[in-house]
Amino acid sequence: LSQAQDQAIRDVVVRQESHGYPVVTDGEFRRHSFQESFSECVAGFDVPKNINLYYEKRNLNETPLERAEQNFEEAGPAIITRRGAAQRLKVVRNLPLEEYRYAESVANVPAKVTILGPDRIAQRFKWESSLNVYKGLDDFVEHIVAIERQMIADLVKAGCKYIQIDAPGYTAYVDKVSLERMRSRGEDPERNLQRSIDADNALIEGFP
């Protein structure tokens, strides 16, 4: 699989360069999901032992031009589904750094990487079942920022000049269904939004 991923990355880098892109990406070929830029880097989430079973049975009942709803409460990978923490999260690898090093090695122009922003991570964290590990969302997000700042620092040290903070979750704050989900969990959407903005600012503070 890693050899196939390597070849796919080389191919997509060449294609981007052939179109004159001044900065290229690796196409995220080493991820099941873009959200793995964080979940694959840490240990401590309460997840099933065999996550592959989730992907094998996953069915979103997708219909063209219609909203596909997902059951975020089912047992599955962290962040793709809402999972709690069995222990405080700890870094076990830096996937974006691994991606950057390979992309940079096969590219003739600078490579960029993406890191999932704190907002999506917080939205998919089952804080209510993790109060024996984290005091609440504020405590959890503060820890996420600390972890991701170290990941970014490692990327900067390796020479990466282009780091995208991926923040798709901000659309939730104008989406009725998502807002209702937050309120049903006892959360204040406006407080969540401000926390996420503050977290993003803290994440990039001091970096060039």
Residue spans of the language-model regions?
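Domain-level signal for soluble alpha/beta catalytic cores
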Residues: L1-P208
